[in-house]
């Protein structure tokens, strides 16, 4: 298996460019001899990176199965690729997953497992005054793409403290910009804070003297929430049930391997960046970033449902309510029942 990526970026952007790493054509319809996998070149997506790089997935699904990898920096882009049938399985945050499930009327996406919990933080400028909620008026706070997981969490946090973004008649400027641009604006002092995933959160702290006001898990019950999920396109699942089961098994094996071999996992991640992205990150950033998340196959269902409630309260899930029945894959569901669900 070979992964080829062409990229010319500085270190701040190297792990978030929406590049495509492809073996063969990504526009082809997938088959039982191929699986097309989407993930981000970031620490929260350590499972696909480590599992593919060290051969766990290749061994688990069979060497005769071709693995195509496609790298993104935006969850909504991944969901659109699911809709276009150019992706079979993907690692992505709960925000885009929920939107995609509802947009397809519950037909196109199933959550197979979790991949990471935590790994997002609210980072502020040391002189911003954002350590007190009373000082948020007029501040400029950034998060990645609108409706993505960090964006929902930031806006919900504001609402929980009786604050609104400017576009909703409030006093806080919420900027939805890419992680590399967040890094640049934070360096220039043009934003006061940012709600970002790892390793960007740690980069803002270690590179730019940002202050980690809190890790997002502090705002969740039991201090845990699903930040990365493994999802599958439902028609691919229907046509490749055994292959998907083998991928899921390999996914869980990779989670266990990472947790048993943290130092080796960090080295594999670092080598992945060097080999496929051209540059890596300082070891101290990788170490701290890994310490701020939990690699797990548990989708933490309650957190996904709570996330939906929060997104709905912000108006992200439509005006007529929402129904998440069937969003979680049930391995004991027989194929005939699954087909009936898919065709309505």
State the predicted function of each range.
Residues 105, 128, 167-171, 175, ...:
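Pocket-lining segment of extracytoplasmic ligand-binding domains
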Residues 58-65, 218-221, 291-299:
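Short, solvent-exposed loop/beta-turn-alpha elements that line the ligand-binding surface or hinge
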Residues 44, 53, 74, 78, ...:
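Stable alpha-helical elements in mature extracytoplasmic
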Residues 238-318:
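Secondary-structure end/capping motifs
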Residues 1-34, 339-344:
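Short, low-complexity disordered leader/linker segments with a strong preference
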Residues 31-176, 192-198, 213:
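Short, glycine-/small- and polar/acidic-enriched structural segments
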Residues 309-344:
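Conserved C-terminal helix/tail region of periplasmic/extracytoplasmic solute-binding proteins
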């Amino acid at each position: 298996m070979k992964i080829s990526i062409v990229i010319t970026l500085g270190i701040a952007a190297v792990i978030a460019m929406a590049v495509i790493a492809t073996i063969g054509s990504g526009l082809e319809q997938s088959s039982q001899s191929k699986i097309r996998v989407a993930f981000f070149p970031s620490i929260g997506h350590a499972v696909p990176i480590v599992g593919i790089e060290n051969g766990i997935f290749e061994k688990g699904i069979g060497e005769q199965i071709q693995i195509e990898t496609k790298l993104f920096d935006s969850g909504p882009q991944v969901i659109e690729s699911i809709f276009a049938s150019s992706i079979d399985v993907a690692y992505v945050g709960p925000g885009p997953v929920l939107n995609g499930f509802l947009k397809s009327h519950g037909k196109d996406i199933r959550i197979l497992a979790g991949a990471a919990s935590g790994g997002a933080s609210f980072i502020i400028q040391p002189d911003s005054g954002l350590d007190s909620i009373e000082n948020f008026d007029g501040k400029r706070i950034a998060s990645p793409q609108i409706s993505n997981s960090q964006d929902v969490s930031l806006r919900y946090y504001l609402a929980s403290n009786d604050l609104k973004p400017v576009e909703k008649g409030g006093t806080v400027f919420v900027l939805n910009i890419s992680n590399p641009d967040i890094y640049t604006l934070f360096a220039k002092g043009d934003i006061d804070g940012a709600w970002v995933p790892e390793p960007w959160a740690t980069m803002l702290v270690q590179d730019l003297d940002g202050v980690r006001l809190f890790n997002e898990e502090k705002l969740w019950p039991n201090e845990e929430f699903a930040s990365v999920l493994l999802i599958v396109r439902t028609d691919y699942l229907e046509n490749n049930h055994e292959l998907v089961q083998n991928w899921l098994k390999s996914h869980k094996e990779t989670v266990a391997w990472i947790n048993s071999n943290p130092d080796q996992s960090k080295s594999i991640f670092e080598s992945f960046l060097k080999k496929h992205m051209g540059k890596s990150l300082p070891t101290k950033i990788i170490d701290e970033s890994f310490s701020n998340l939990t690699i797990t196959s548990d989708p933490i269902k309650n957190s996904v449902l709570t996330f939906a409630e929060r997104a709905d309260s912000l108006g992200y899930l439509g005006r007529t309510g929402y129904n998440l029945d069937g969003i979680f894959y049930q391995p004991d569901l027989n194929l005939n029942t699954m087909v009936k669900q898919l065709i309505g």
